[in-house]
Amino acid sequence: MNNLKGYAIANDGNMKRIAITYDVIDDETGKPTALNKKTNMFITDASVLETIRQIDAFAQGIIDNQ
């Protein structure tokens, strides 16, 4: 089983990229077999990009009102 530990969304030129950190857990023992594994990829799914745009607008609204 893969246990998501965290992720970050970043601008990379005109694209959005997601960086993910996770642990691999043995299904039978429940013990970790690999810690802090990382992967990243460009986000191309339109619905995911729209969700990110909404979160970006929310975050911008917070700092605009500080």
Regions found by a protein language model. Name each.
Residues 1-29:
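Short, charged/polar N-terminal "headpieces" of proteins
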Residues 2-6, 31-66:
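Acidic, low-complexity intrinsically disordered segments
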